[in-house]
């Protein structure tokens, strides 16, 4: 770390602020696995350091979709026609203001490429069609000439992945990632860097230094570089005062404050292993992240992703209105999954299950007969 004690007036906060430490890559010889937090033979620990960061919700927040990427990794793949049908419904759900802003596609199979091309032919502005690749030269060749503007690039950032999966050092991993990202920029693409396993990563030893390098590359090239903070194992914690690497507020605040990542270049990708996908996604919004990544009905790896429909209603509650989104499409999507895809949605799933607003308790039924507002969440 290099200290700089200059004090300047911030144009963002209108307060005098001391210039920040510049965090440098810590190229350690042994992996940092945070065994005191993740002992593996026990339930992970939630530790506190009582450092609180301010809420800073962006003016514009939006939803992105990974149903055709992460959503397909956990189930029988969709057919080309099913992806086209679902994409049309996502377009209607997101409305004219594009609150459902983007969706991402695999490009490894002919079926996925055909679906991508057919969806592009529809000419919709939203959801913008993007892709996902690994940080390899061969994967990059798959996307550089297919007409998309933005591609996701997998950049695993925890030592679990860098040391144990990829058999690299942190320095080698960063150099590899920066090489592929630079190639994407040279080909005219906007990179979206997926910081895999960020909630088990050495935040100040790798995450912030890497994000800082990406922001330098963005400034030098004039190309926006987005960072998707991926809570790959669902370890993220929303509670104020929780220590890194599990703190969602701390992760978002640090990427903005220490690495200089703008809110509109930040996105959160959550998993539901500890039932926290929705609250962590909302927390990411509240602390400065513009985008939250979701999948239809939360279908995704293991316990799934953040349900898209849940974030539609989180958006409405936080912003005060739907901003053009058409929530009737959510019911159409549920019916399509049941009838056309053959996917069973549990009856008590919020907003989409057949019984989500059904009551069988006698005292509740009595209340509903007297006034339906007593036991209905709103006029659904």
Spans of features found by a protein language model:
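N-terminal active-site wall of soluble small-molecule enzyme domains
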Residues: 107-132, 136-142
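Catalytic alpha/beta core domains of metabolic enzymes, predominantly
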Residues: 233-379
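Short hydrophobic alpha-helical runs that function as membrane-insertion/retention elements
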Residues: 128-130, 152, 291-294
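Alpha/beta enzyme core
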Residues: 53, 58-63, 75-99, 118-122, ...
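Active-site beta-loop-alpha junctions enriched in small/polar residues
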Residues: 69, 106-110, 132-136, 156-158, ...
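N-terminal amphipathic, basic-rich helices that act as targeting or association modules
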Residues: 1-6, 78, 99-104
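A mid-to-C-terminal "edge-of-domain" accessory segment
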Residues: 7-9, 13-69, 321-380
């Amino acid at each position: 770390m290099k200290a700089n004690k200059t004090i300047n007036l911030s144009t963002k906060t209108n307060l005098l602020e001391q210039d920040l430490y510049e965090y440098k890559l810590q190229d350690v010889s042994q992996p940092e696995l945070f065994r005191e937090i993740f002992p593996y033979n026990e339930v992970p620990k939630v530790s506190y350091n009582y450092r609180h960061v301010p809420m800073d919700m962006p003016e514009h927040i939006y939803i992105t979709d990974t149903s055709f990427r992460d959503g397909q990794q956990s189930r029988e793949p969709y057919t080309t026609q099913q992806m086209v049908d679902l994409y049309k419904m996502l377009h209607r759900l997101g409305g004219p203001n594009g609150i459902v802003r983007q969706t991402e596609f695999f490009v490894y199979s002919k079926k996925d490429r055909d679906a991508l091309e057919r969806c592009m032919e529809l000419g919709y502005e939203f959801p913008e069609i993007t892709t996902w690749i690994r940080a390899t030269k061969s994967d990059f060749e798959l996307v550089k000439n297919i007409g998309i503007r933005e591609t996701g690039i997998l950049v695993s950032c925890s030592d679990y992945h860098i040391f144990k999966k990829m058999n690299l050092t942190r320095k080698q991993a960063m150099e590899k990632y920066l090489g592929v990202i630079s190639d994407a920029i040279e080909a005219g693409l906007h990179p979206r860097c997926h910081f895999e396993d960020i909630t088990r990563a050495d935040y100040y030893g790798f995450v912030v230094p890497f994000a800082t390098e990406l922001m330098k590359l963005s400034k030098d090239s004039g190309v926006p570089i987005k960072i998707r903070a991926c809570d790959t194992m669902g370890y993220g914690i929303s509670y104020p005062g929780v220590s890194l690497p599990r703190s969602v507020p701390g992760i978002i605040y640090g990427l903005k404050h220490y690495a200089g990542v703008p809110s509109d270049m930040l996105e959160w990708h959550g998993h539901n292993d500890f039932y926290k996908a929705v609250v962590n996604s909302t927390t990411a919004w509240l602390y400065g992240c513009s985008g939250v990544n979701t999948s239809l009905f939360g279908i995704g790896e293991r316990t799934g992703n953040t349900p898209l429909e849940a974030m539609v209603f989180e958006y409405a509650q936080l912003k005060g209105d739907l901003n053009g989104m058409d929530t009737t499409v959510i019911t159409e999507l549920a019916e399509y999954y049941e009838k056309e895809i053959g996917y069973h949605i549990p009856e008590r799933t919020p907003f989409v299950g057949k019984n989500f607003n059904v009551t069988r308790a006698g005292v509740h039924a009595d209340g509903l007969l007297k006034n339906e507002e007593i036991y209905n969440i709103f006029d659904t």
